[in-house]
A protein has these predicted regions:
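Lipid deacylating catalytic domains
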Residues: 13-16, 25, 85-89, 100, ...
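Catalytic metal-binding/acid-base residues of hydrolase active sites
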Residues: 42, 71, 115-116, 148
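Structural motif
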Residues: 33-34, 107-109, 141
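The alpha/beta-hydrolase serine catalytic core
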Residues: 2-15, 128-212
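Active-site signature of alpha/beta-hydrolase-fold catalytic machinery across serine-
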Residues: 122-126
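Gly/Ala-rich beta-loop-alpha elbow adjacent to hydrolase catalytic centers
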Residues: 111-120
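Catalytic nucleophile-loop/oxyanion-hole region of alpha/beta-hydrolase
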Residues: 47, 71-107
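Short, surface-exposed "cap/lid" segments of acyl-processing enzymes
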Residues: 17-74, 95
Length: 212
């Protein structure tokens, strides 16, 4: 039996409009403390099942829960970088600290889930400037929940497959040649063409089998 996910109530808005518009969702925006949640590989806003419970606990502690969309979400893995994620998190943090209504005046915390923990470590590995104030973005804490790296995920899920190992070898060769942004052949991913009364699995294959 599939249980319907618990709903979350809050505010949906944009934290940036250039060079691409990116949204975020916040529960209990009136609280001075903010926790930015960063999900793992192929996940995006609202996917992780314990978020309603987390939001409830955070509310008691006068924290709002913030989920956001970044360019590497869903099928963006393999075409993005951890530093790129960190820069988008910095843009979100700057917005939360400087927005006119209910800004972050208390503590700002990052929480990574699974491979999202890599973004927490990358963000905290160097200073991040608040371009609106000229000061360093101050983060009061970083939480790593069930941490795992991309390579560990690969080894536990795809590493035993010959096709995956072949693609990994090709990707390493591209890096050696100075082509870290090169895309590998994705012909092994069969496009979903079947349809029953206009319904099917959509583009889920590109998310469930992301680029290496």
């Amino acid at each position: 039996m599939v249980h319907e996910p618990s709903p979350l109530q809050g505010t949906l808005r944009l934290f940036q409009t250039e060079p691409i518009s990116l949204p975020y969702f916040e529960t209990n925006a009136q609280h001075p403390n903010k926790l930015i949640f960063i999900p793992g590989l192929t996940d995006t806003m609202g996917v992780v099942p314990y978020l309603p419970s987390l939001a409830s606990v955070l509310n008691d502690l006068e924290y709002s829960l913030i989920q956001f969309v970044k360019c590497s979400d869903l099928g963006g893995f393999g075409t993005s970088s951890l530093e790129g994620d960190a820069q988008e998190i910095a843009q979100l943090a700057e917005h939360l600290l400087t927005r006119s209504d209910s800004p972050c005046t208390g503590k700002l915390v990052l929480m990574g889930h699974s491979t999202g923990c890599q973004d927490v470590v990358t963000f905290l590995s160097e200073e991040r400037l608040n371009l609106k104030t000229g000061q360093q973005i101050l983060v009061h804490g970083g939480i790593c929940q069930a941490p795992v790296s991309d390579s560990e995920y690969f080894d536990s899920h795809d590493g035993s497959q010959n096709s995956a190992r072949e693609l990994l070898s090709k990707s390493q060769e591209c890096v050696k040649k100075g082509l870290p942004g090169a895309l590998l052949d994705r012909s092994h991913i069969s496009p979903v063409r079947t349809s029953l009364k206009g319904r099917g699995e959509g583009n889920s294959a590109t998310v469930l089998t992301p680029a290496f």
